[in-house]
Regions:
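Bacterial N-terminal signal peptides that target proteins for export
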Residues: 1-13
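Hydrophobic faces of well-ordered beta-strands that scaffold small-molecule active sites
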Residues: 52-57, 82-84, 107-112, 142-144, ...
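An N-terminally biased module of ancient metal coordination in phosphate/nucleic-acid-related enzymes
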Residues: 24-105
Length: 361
């Protein structure tokens, strides 16, 4: 009897081992959904500690009903104003302004650049005229311009293929932005994870695989070259005000952005859509944001849902530890609250945005 029982136990143990081993071998990282077992505080920040201006959002609401719901959500969570980066000129820009026109206190609009006919005689005059027209229609800034190495491809309807922000041909346009007091919001490069091989050593998988930057294309600028192009434009246009998106995509080394802040008073950066990149290193990030509290602005770039806003508030305000937001951010790593002091939050949430919106060259 004892021998039979022992065999049954050994058999069950082997079966359990095999089952676990198979499960381990079959588990894909994209399906990994860890749940924290730590009994640590779970803070719900229903409303931001100070009034918020979201300096980086887009045209997420496509119907009057959706816009009305967005406004209700903003009021509920404490976002008093949202900047909609339309990318667009022409009728595309006009249609966004018209659709949101019922809520002038809640939304600001930024337009793109018009590259139609770039390189041909008269292009710059046309581009400036369209910029002025957009300004009269309601544009109060430029953005989001975007260059991941192949030129400023975000602008609509005509992207600036091969045109980087420091291209001398753009200088009259940048000068006109300064004259009209229109800040220039620009996305250059991507974060370091997106340039690394999508292999077992990349701690940003699977998100880095999704946003991977292919550097095999001839003439494509890399991360450091794109940061140089941004610096050139900021340096050569001191009366223009620039806002680098996403911590200038330097989350793995915020000192890169800090060096630019130290040199150029006309440069700011938003923190949009990089909460998951910086919250795994909370002490480093909090120290950086405290040091440069006058140069950073809140942004989301992640939709219009209340849960999204509250997740960003939790990261900025709480001291929560080791929690996951896989569905929001796509990373498998745990997040940590930055527990920023009130004076930092007040500036990042709203005061710096007011300086940008009302800046005088």
């Amino acid at each position: 009897m004892k021998r039979t029982l022992l065999k049954m136990i050994l058999s069950s143990s082997c079966l359990l081992y095999v089952t676990v081993a198979v499960a381990q071998n079959d588990l894909l990282l994209k399906n990994y959904r860890p749940v924290s077992i730590y009994h640590t505080p779970k803070t719900l920040v229903s409303k931001a500690a100070f009034p918020v201006t979201d300096m980086h959002s887009h045209d997420f609401a496509k119907t009057p009903e959706a816009i009305a719901q967005w406004v209700r959500t903003m009021d509920e969570v404490g976002v008093k104003k949202t900047v909609i980066l339309t990318y667009s000129t022409g009728s595309g820009f006009d249609s966004v302004v018209d659709r949101y026109g019922k809520y002038p206190e809640h939304f600001l609009f930024y337009c793109g650049f018009d590259y139609t006919g770039f390189g041909k005689p008269g292009w710059i005059q046309h581009a400036i005229a369209e910029l002025e027209r957009c300004y009269k229609k309601g544009a109060r800034g430029i953005g989001e311009l975007g260059d991941k190495g192949e030129g400023e491809l975000y602008s609509r309807p005509t992207p600036g293929v091969g045109i980087h922000i420091d291209n001398p041909a753009l200088k009259p346009l940048l000068q006109k932005c300064a004259e009209l007091k229109m800040p220039i919001v620009i996305h250059v490069a991507e974060d370091q994870w997106m340039y690394e091989a999508a292999d077992s050593t990349n701690d940003g998988l699977m998100n880095s695989a999704h946003w991977h930057v292919n550097m095999n294309k001839p003439g494509k600028l890399g991360h450091d070259e794109l940061l140089v192009s941004l610096e050139n434009a900021v340096k050569e246009n001191p009366k223009a005000l620039f806002v680098a998106c996403h911590f200038a995509n330097s989350c793995a080394n915020l000192d890169v952005l800090g060096r630019l802040f130290d040199k150029y008073p006309n440069l700011y950066a938003d923190i949009a859509a990089r909460y998951a990149e910086v919250s795994p290193v909370p002490r480093y990030t909090a120290a950086f944001m405290t040091k440069y509290k006058d140069r950073l602005v809140y942004g989301t770039d992640m939709g219009d849902q209340a849960k999204m806003y509250r997740t960003t508030f939790r990261i900025l305000e709480s001291a929560d530890e080791h929690f996951y937001e896989k569905d929001q951010f796509s990373y498998h790593w745990p997040l940590y609250g930055l527990h920023l002091p009130g004076d930092v939050l007040k500036k990042v949430y709203g005061e710096n945005a007011e300086k940008i919106i009302n800046y005088k060259p």
